[in-house]
Amino acid sequence: MKSLGIDIGSSSVKVSLLDIPTGECVASATNPAAEMPIEALRSGWAEQDPEMWWHYVREGIRQIAVKHPMREVAAIGITYQMHGLVALSEEGEPLRKSIIWCDSRAVGIGAEALEEIGREFCLEHTLNSPGNFTASKLAWVKRNEPEIFAKIHKFMLPGDYIAYRLSGRMSTSISGLSEQILWDFKEERRADFVADRYGIPHAMIPDADVSIGIQAHTDAATERELGIPAGTPISYRAGDQPNNAFSLNVMEAGEIAATGGTSGVVYGVTDTPKADPQSRVNTFVHVNHTPGKPRYGILLCINGTGIMNSWIRRNVAQQTMDYAEMNRLAASVPAGSEGLLVVPFGNGAERVLGNRCTGAGIVNIDLNRHTTAHILRAAQEGIAYSFRYGIDIMRGLGLSPDIIRAGQANLFLSPLFRQTLATLTGARIELFNTDGALGAARGAALGAGLYKTREEAFASLRRLEVVEPVAADREALEAGYRAWVAEVERKIQNS
């Protein structure tokens, strides 16, 4: 008996197959071989075609099915890039490309809504400003593409769209409503006042399900095309960051997870609804939330994380080095990169900077001393500095990151990055044998009742490595961090 996990990223789509009795991943497929394109028709825009995601979901399932018959699949879980807008016609066709998470076009619309609804009311009820989230993106479509808006039957998130393609049912989740800024935390219900402010008909908002539990069943078309038996439950759905926390068994108040993909995230669980007055970090409904046992996730997002490292590889390393070689060369430079700084904020508006687009930068280059190796190290340190910057904000909300859990993937594959982050934050970093697709598969098995308890679901989760702070590097990194903060403040003033 198997569980299928699907991870819709912005760079790739991964599909993993979990053997439920052993808890082991028996197969996985990641597509495409190169990164999926992100279309940017204007500065600050970012779009992807939902049909592209669905294409690569099918490709991955077919690749796995060569050796593992899909008739063995007993549950399906989906995780996805958060906040993206998918607008569907009554026939279920996408009416435009998805405006994805790193698109900044709706920042001004969100700011207008915050002032009109009232900052205090928003922070009390939605725990966030409307910002650049999904509802604001839809309001942009209403204002700028009225002919498309008029045809919208339902709007949803990227993972909701994949669930629809598998089942024929248009739905979202309560956690999903919260990431769209359409959840009222105080009243424990949909935040219709946000939709009303934007002129969004309530009928456009899909029904919302729990994240862990049966939400829909696959249809006959999925069985014909992919071999997954009709009636297979879709029993888990979560945005990539709540899912990353779930994958690491970060479910209780005080526990903290991190990831370093295209964007970087620190996600801390609390049982008390808390809001940052400046909305630099955001609070969402966690996957195991219930009214009687509330669980919320405070999310710090740095848009320019893995994408910064990827840019450095393309434009500095000239793609002659893989990431492992880049890490080795970067490690040849001392902590602090001998004064060279990289500011990684070049992938849209950064919430942690008050929704500003400051741009990225390489600062303090000494033409007589600094080399490619310095730039490689400074890039990873700059990303770690941005994590520290946000974690200091989270500390102000009562979270204390003494231990940070992460999957051994993406930037956390870099010994230099994880060592730098541990030293800067003073936290122990624990690395585990999991990823988003595998976590979604585990969640689906739990949601379908194939695992009876959380303890059973996570029995096979293994800690692979522990990274402790390095005292000898602390002074150099603290000095680098202070200089980096000064540069960020200068960029904020000029933005």
Put a short name on every predicted segment:
Residues 1-96, 151, 223-224, 228-233, ...:
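N-terminal glycine/serine-rich phosphate-binding loop of ATP-dependent small-molecule kinases
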Residues 3-5, 17, 107, 111-169, ...:
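Active-site core segments that coordinate phosphate-bearing ligands/cofactors
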Residues 23, 49, 76, 103, ...:
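Residue-level signal for inorganic ion chemistry
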Residues 26-29, 206, 465:
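Structural signal for short hydrophobic segments within the conserved structured cores
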Residues 44, 62-101, 127-132, 159, ...:
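Short beta-strand-loop/turn "lid" adjacent to the catalytic site in phosphate-handling enzymes
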Residues 69-72, 204, 384, 400:
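Short loop/turn motifs at secondary-structure junctions
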Residues 103, 216-221:
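Short, glycine/charge-rich flexible loops or terminal/linker lids adjacent to PRPP-binding catalytic cores
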Residues 198-210:
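A conserved helix-loop-beta module that forms one wall/lid of the active-site cleft
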